[in-house]
């Protein structure tokens, strides 16, 4: 009777060992992978695209900011003056271009023809006078200087006649295509300067680029600012991302889209929910700021986890425990 008892006890022991091992394995599986990370710090330095004197700031540190909200303004006066000058430049260029397209009026052509006749008469007189002076110089009646003066007057009258003839020819044939093209280019340049002046004036108003919380107010009204200098620093509140790191052994468990549970010290019994949004393709050494029981020399891959039910209690930079378990996969 002892032998069957021993066999029974042995079988019972084996079953107990198997059951215990199964329970231990399943509990380990339910525990799943645990990682440690932080809520990403995401900030935007807000600045004017143009420089000038800061006229006003409408927000203070800690304020809740909405996208499109007016945050502050520069002194508009210099940019309003530049806009007026640009508008005048467009008007002048437009008038010149229209004049080039329209050509010359009949009255202008008639005036140019009269100028040619007058210049022709003056040239004829100067030429005849020069001819007479040549005869007198040959007979030694006048000096060489008198003859040179007559020749100079003749040449000047000839140049005046040539200029009047060219002007009349231009009036009759209209403006050259090159001149019209140049006038059109000048008009387009003036319009571009006007558009830039309008944009510069618009950029004297500082607009919030996104929703968030104001972290820093770096300057005060009255300050002279250069273009691009930081005026305000905005902390972006949505979406909330968690940055965590995983080693190569567990990399296969971190597929994008997988559901995750996120625990904080402030609410250990009420996890946040998230999804893996990005897995870095490049390995790096574990950053010193990350809490991890593993060796710092391990190569790890960065994860971005998108929190789907974030609230105001989840602050940027806050440490977070990331759980990959059965519950997270099925919630």
UniProtKB/Swiss-Prot annotation:
Q: Print the keywords alphabetically.
A: Coiled coil, Periplasm, Signal
What start-end ranges are recorded for coiled-coil regions in this protein?
A: 107-208
What InterPro entries does UniProt report for this protein, alphabetically? CusB_D23, UPF0194_membrane_YbhG, UPF0194_transport
The answer to whether keyword Transcription regulation applies is no
Signal peptide feature range: 1-19
> What's any one GO cellular component for it?
periplasmic space
Q: Could you tell me where this protein is found in the cell?
A: Periplasm
The protein's matches in NCBIfam families, at most eight in alphabetical order, are given as: PRK03598.1
Protein family (similarity comment): Belongs to the UPF0194 family.
Record's protein name: UPF0194 membrane protein YbhG
Give the organism, scientific name: Salmonella gallinarum (strain 287/91 / NCTC 13346)
Q: Tell me the organism's taxonomic lineage.
A: Bacteria, Pseudomonadati, Pseudomonadota, Gammaproteobacteria, Enterobacterales
Q: Please name the gene that encodes this protein.
A: ybhG
